[in-house]
Structure formats: C-alpha cells, structure tokens
UniProtKB/Swiss-Prot annotation:
Contributes to K(+)/H(+) antiport activity by supporting proton efflux to control proton extrusion and homeostasis in chloroplasts in a light-dependent manner to modulate photosynthesis. Prevents excessive induction of non-photochemical quenching (NPQ) under continuous-light conditions. Indirectly promotes efficient inorganic carbon uptake into chloroplasts. GO terms for biological process: potassium ion transport. HAMAP family: CemA_PxcA. One of its GO terms (molecular function) is antiporter activity. The keyword Membrane applies. InterPro entries: CemA. The chain crosses the membrane at residues 249-269, 349-369, 395-415, 432-452. The lineage of its organism: Eukaryota, Viridiplantae, Streptophyta, Coleochaetophyceae, Coleochaetales. It is found in: Plastid, Chloroplast inner membrane. GO terms for cellular component: chloroplast inner membrane. This is Potassium/proton antiporter CemA. It catalyses: K(+)(in) + H(+)(out) = K(+)(out) + H(+)(in). Belongs to the CemA family.
Length: 472
C-alpha cells in the first residue's frame, strides 16, 4: 500500500515540476525570438519577403510557445491544487520516512522528481555518481527537507521568470511587433545603405523590389555583400530558410482552406439538417412539382418520347406474343416516375441555392478574417510568377488569354453560362447567354491589357516583348 502511495506521489511531483520546466524552456524560446527580431527585419532588405510574412512568422512562433506555456501552466496549477489539498508537509514527511537509502530504484526515482528531464536522461555512470551524492544528502530527515525546499525555491524562481516573460511579451508585441511605424522605421534604417527612398508599407508590400533609381539586381547584390562582410551569412541563411518555409506553408494552407473549408461546411450543413428540412418543406407545403418552365418543357418532351417508345414496344410484343398489353397503365407508371424525378430535381435546385449561399458566405468570412494571409498568398504567387523565365511567363499569359478570350472561347463561355443557369434553376434564355458571352470576355480582355500596360510593362518589359512576339 505504501509503495502505491509512493508511486502516486512520485507521479504528481514529476508531472508538477516537469510542466513548470517545459513552460520555462518555452519562455526561453520567446526571449530568443525577441532577441532575433531585428535580424528578421533585415531580411526585408533583399525584398524577397513581405513585411506581413515576417510579422506573421514571428507572431506564429510566439503563439506556438504561448500555447505550450499556457498548457503546461494549466497542468501545473491543477496538480498544485491536488498537492495543496494533500499538504506539502505530509508529502515531504512521507517521502523522508519511507525512502530506503539502499534501494537504488527509489534513489533514482527521488532524483527524477527533483531533476529536469535532460538531467535524468544522462548516462548511467553519471546517474550512479549523482546517486552517491544523493545518499549522503538523505542521511537525515533534516537534509531531505533542505533538498525539498531547495528544489521548491528553484522552481518558484522559474515560475516567476515565466510570468515575467508573459507580462513583458504583451508590452513587446504592442510596441515592437504590432507597431508598424517602428517596424517600418527599422526596415528603412537597414535599407539606407542601399539608397532606398520609399518607405515600406505594411499593407502594400510585395514579394519583389519596388521600382526605383537603382536596379534591383544591384541592391540585391549589395545586400548579400553586406551580409558577408558582417559575418552573419549563416544566421541569415537559416532565417531566410525559415521565412521561405513559413511563406510557402501559409500560402498553401490558406489556398486549401479557401477550397475545402466552404465545401466541407456546405456538406455538413446539407447532411445534418438542410436536405431533410427542404424535402419536408417542399413535399408538405408545396403542391407543384416543377420550379420553372424549363422543367415542364423537358418533362413534356420526355413523356412524349416514352409514350412513343411504349407504343413501339407494345406493337412489337403483340406481333411476337399475340397478347395485348395495357398501354394506359404503363404510361401512368412512367408518368409517376417522371414526377418523382422532377420533384427531386426541384428539391436539389433549392438545396443548391442554400448551399451556394453558405459557401459564398464562408468564403467571404475567410477572406475578411484572413486579410494578412491573403496578402502573404498574393506575395507568394507574385514571387512564384516572377521567378519564372520570360518565355514561361509569356506562355502562361498566352494560354490564359486563349482559353478565356481567344477565338474558340465563346463556345466555352456559352456552355459554362448554360451550366450555371441550370445549376441555379433558371430556364435557358439564348438572349441572356448571348449578351453575357459577348460582353464578359471583352471586359476580361480589357482588364488584361490594362494589367500588361500599367503593371507588367513597368516590372519586366522583356515579358511584354516576348508576349507580343509569341502572340504574333
């Protein structure tokens, strides 16, 4: 029985101090991130990452540490309540009165209680040497109480350190991380060596260099040269790699959320309550079957075709078998099947309207809440596009223009618009389709030409020349 109580107390104490030690290590990581903050801002001198990327990367790393700190502190406080309920004096007296000094397992257990995980995972020889010291310290109850108090004071200092780091972090975030004037001032100070005159913008920063007096290749070379002179190339490469990894991961994660999250929410709503509610409402409160004139026309044409096929089947069967069949009963049966089919089709049209509204609403919410991630995605797409060769850029532009506004594109637009109207439950109207087909590609072509003239021609004139050459 005493051994079971001892095992329970040992588990509580190990978890108690282990949680606090983990929170202490995470607070050290936060302090390290704060110390490296200015070096991360220097990465923007190469203009390969936007300010949103740097700020969100630092914020995400700090939030990870905060999550583990809060989790370990929560477990620490829960176990502390249990220990206070039992009584620290009772636990200390129990351990001092029931520890067998000659038992190596118990000695190692006591050492594990009052040691960090890293210290306990050392070699067996080091554990044996510590064990000898521990035996000397446990000769009397007085020495044991002294050791217990010593480790208690040590971990209380660690707890005070963690609380101080958390309080300091709030002030640091408001003054440094989220203070964009200070952030841009630091960026501009690092860029004075490279003759940058335009201040960096938090909301409009791009993944490539802004147009200025000095060519971009020269500023990039000077930035790398300064890094080599200062001897910070290794740390610069590590930080650059971390930012690039975070940049790509956040962009892909945001694209996946924009694609799959609206679809997942609509499917959950549809399967949980939406489909059953619409079916019950339509079948009980509505007397009609068709929701638009197009459904009636299609149903009538289908019924006429079925009637003609039944007449043909009946004529063939009477000639072969010589027995007349009831044509009216067969037509009535097929009519009921058509009514059930178009009744379900009407339910699906209404269901599509609700699910499309939910999907669009979810997408808008994601775009509003993820403005910073959208800016990172924008800079990542631009970085990927501008890292391609001029020939590949021109090829992609030509492929997009030929698919959307090329010679054969009107037929594709007509099919797409017909499918959209049918999905929304509208009847086919050739005048509306012709109007949309004749106007929408023209608007898209105008926007593309404006983008080439206003933006692409300034960023890379060689792309425009290659584009016109391939287009001709």
């Amino acid at each position: 029985m005493k051994l079971i109580i001892y095992q329970i107390i040992k588990f509580l104490l190990i978890t108690y101090y282990d949680c606090l030690h983990k929170a202490y290590n995470e607070s050290k990581k936060i302090q390290k991130i704060q110390n490296e903050y200015i070096s991360y801002t220097q990465l923007l001198t190469s203009a390969q990452h936007s300010s949103q990327t740097v700020i969100l990367y630092i914020d995400s790393e700090i939030n990870k540490c905060l999550f583990f700190i809060n989790l370990n502190l929560f477990k620490y406080k829960i176990i502390k309540l249990v220990i206070n309920f039992i009584g620290e004096d009772k636990i200390s007296n129990f351990l001092s009165n029931h520890v067998d000094i000659k038992n190596e397992y118990v000695n190692l257990s006591i050492e594990k209680i009052f040691s960090s995980n890293s210290d306990f995972r050392k070699s067996q020889s080091e554990s044996n040497s510590k064990n000898l010291v521990l035996k000397k310290n446990l000769d009397t109850n007085k020495n044991f109480h002294f050791d217990f108090l010593k480790y208690k004071i040590k971990y209380e200092r660690q707890l005070a350190w963690v609380e101080a780091v958390l309080e300091d972090l709030k002030i640091w975030k408001d003054f440094y991380l989220y203070n964009f004037d200070f952030f841009n001032k630091k960026i501009n100070n690092t860029r004075r060596f490279f003759f940058f005159n335009k201040p960096s913008s938090y909301t409009l920063s791009l993944s490539y260099e802004s147009i200025g007096l000095i060519p971009r290749s020269i500023t990039r070379t000077l930035s790398k040269f300064q890094t080599e002179l200062l001897g910070n190339s290794y740390s610069y490469i590590i930080q650059e790699f971390r930012l690039a990894k975070y940049h790509t991961w956040v962009s892909l994660q945001y694209v996946a959320s924009l694609i799959f999250l609206p679809w997942l929410i609509t499917k959950l709503c549809q399967n949980l309550f939406l489909q059953s509610w619409i079916e019950n409402w339509w079948n009980t409160s509505q007397s009609q079957i068709f929701i638009n004139l197009s459904q009636q026309t299609k149903a009538l044409q289908r019924l006429q075709q079925l009637e003609e096929l039944l007449w043909l089947d009946m004529a063939m069967s009477e000639r072969i078998e010589g027995q007349p069949q009831d044509l009216g009963a067969l037509i009535h049966q097929r009519t009921i099947q058509l009514a059930e089919y178009y009744n379900q089709d009407s339910i699906n049209i209404i269901l599509h309207l609700f699910t499309d509204f939910i999907a669009i609403f979810t997408l808008i919410v994601l775009l509003i809440l993820g403005k910073k991630r959208l800016a990172i995605l924008n800079s990542w797409v631009q970085e990927v596009f501008y890292s391609l060769t001029d020939t590949m850029k021109a090829f992609l532009i030509l492929l997009f223009t030929d698919l959307c506004i090329g010679f054969h594109s009107p037929h594709g637009w007509e099919i797409a618009i017909d499918g959209l109207l049918e999905h929304l439950g509208f009847a086919h109207n050739k005048y509306i389709v012709s109007c949309l087909v004749s106007t929408f590609p023209v608007i898209l072509d105008t926007v593309l030409k404006y983008w080439i003239f206003r933006h692409l021609n300034r960023i890379s004139p060689s792309i425009v020349v290659t584009y016109h050459t391939m287009n001709e």
